């Protein structure tokens, strides 16, 4: 049974790693086609770490969710080691996607404007990041809040940032990662049993 489990995990990891590489290649090629003069090889290399933030989050979350689902459906529970991963995964994933979204606000400083206008534009562009940070604070010890809040956040990102065929990449970069954060919170809420409090020794 353990050998089958390890083999399944290995195959799943390889498949998701291949999908990650193909997705990075597809994004790089699409950017090069749109503007071949701007997208030089060194700029493509710099874009890879940036694109890797949501994509590693995306495929990493899928890996954790599939492994958790398989263990839960087979054994009725998840192992203690996986339970720790599930507990921290949505919180760390939320921090990553908030950081990724906030990076786009740095474009404001390329504009020609007064310092006050730049600061105002920077804060305006960071409204989604600040909003998700507030949601994460409320959800940190309440997985059910995280599930509902990030599910709503994914829906809002889909409404405002996916409005046509040319904005479909935003599904992979924003909507799906945020949606998977919600699912990770759901698994933390529904599948992880709270640890019973330590029993007080009567002899103490």
Give the role of each language-model region.
Residues 1-8, 66-86, 193-204:
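Membrane-interfacial, low-structure loops and terminal tails that flank and connect transmembrane helices
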């Amino acid at each position: 049974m353990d050998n089958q489990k390890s083999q399944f995990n290995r195959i799943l990891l390889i498949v998701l790693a291949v999908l990650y590489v193909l997705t990075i290649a597809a994004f790089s090629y699409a950017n090069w086609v749109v503007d071949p003069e701007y997208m030089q090889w060194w700029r493509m290399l710099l874009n890879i770490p940036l694109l890797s933030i949501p994509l590693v989050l995306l495929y990493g979350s899928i890996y954790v969710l599939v492994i958790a689902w398989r263990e839960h459906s087979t054994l009725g529970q998840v192992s203690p080691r996986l339970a720790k991963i599930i507990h921290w995964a949505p919180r760390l994933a939320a921090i990553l996607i908030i950081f990724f979204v906030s990076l786009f606000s740095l474009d404001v400083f390329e504009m020609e404007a007064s310092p006050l206008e730049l600061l105002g534009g920077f804060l305006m562009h960071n409204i989604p990041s600040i909003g998700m940070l507030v949601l994460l604070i409320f959800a940190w010890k309440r997985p059910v809040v995280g599930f509902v809040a990030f599910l709503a956040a994914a829906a809002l990102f889909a409404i405002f940032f996916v409005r046509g065929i040319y904005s479909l990449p935003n599904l992979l970069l924003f909507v799906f990662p945020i949606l998977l954060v919600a699912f990770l919170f759901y698994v933390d809420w529904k599948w992880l049993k709270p640890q019973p409090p330590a029993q007080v020794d009567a002899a103490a």
